[in-house]
Amino acid sequence: MSEIKLNYHKTHFLTSAPNIRSIPEDTGIEIAFAGRSNAGKSTALNALTNQKNLARTSKTPGRTQLINLFEVEPNCKLVDLPGYGYAAVPEQMKIQWQKSLGEYLQKRECLAGLVVLMDIRHPLKDLDQQMIEWAVSANLPVLLLLTKADKLSQSARSKQVKMVREAILPFQGDIQVEAFSAQNKIGIDKLAAKLDFWFSPLFAK
């Protein structure tokens, strides 16, 4: 397989969908981004694409209730899934989101990988683990990004990464763990390299 390097700065908004049934047809390759409502998902997407307002960041966690799709190249899509786990969201809506997320991860044929974002200071909450379980049971590779890494010293950061790497061993899936900071540009290159790898079958000669 030839090594590719996509230009994520060219990424543009494609469409929004209220639920999985409304997502455009199941073609090409999609990579999904998931995380708790305050994990910094939109910020990470904006840092990857070097666009301040590509994914709207909200002062109110849980605001992203739509599934947002972005196109990097024709047939190469990034999918921003609704943030989960925010206390102020009505219980019924939370249950609906979780059902929809599980359905998407397990049934979407063109889904090639899942990026789960977690605050490095509070990783592996119940819903994060649920996302990883769904992905592993669907044989979906996972990149765990420990966001807001700039909030910790380098030694504390390394300790957290090591702890999470050990904690995920029982999942027995294809899971990579990296520290990430949009502010200090930590881990953006690793994120781009993983996305390139997941998209590469489209460009295989």
Curated annotation (Swiss-Prot):
GO MF annotations, alphabetized: GTP binding; metal ion binding
Keywords recorded for this protein, A-Z: Cell cycle, Cell division, GTP-binding, Magnesium, Metal-binding, Nucleotide-binding, Septation
Binding site residues for Mg(2+): S42, T64
GO cellular component: cytosol
Domain EngB-type G per the UniProt entry, residue ranges: 27-201
Biological processes per GO annotation: division septum assembly
Disulfide partners: none
Binding site for GTP: 35-42, 62-66, 80-83, 147-150, 180-182
Pfam short name (any one): MMR_HSR1
Required cofactor(s): Mg(2+)
SUPFAM superfamilies, per database record: P-loop containing nucleoside triphosphate hydrolases
Family statement drawn from the similarity comment of this UniProt entry: Belongs to the TRAFAC class TrmE-Era-EngA-EngB-Septin-like GTPase superfamily. EngB GTPase family.
Function: Necessary for normal cell division and for the maintenance of normal septation.
Name under which the protein is recorded: Probable GTP-binding protein EngB
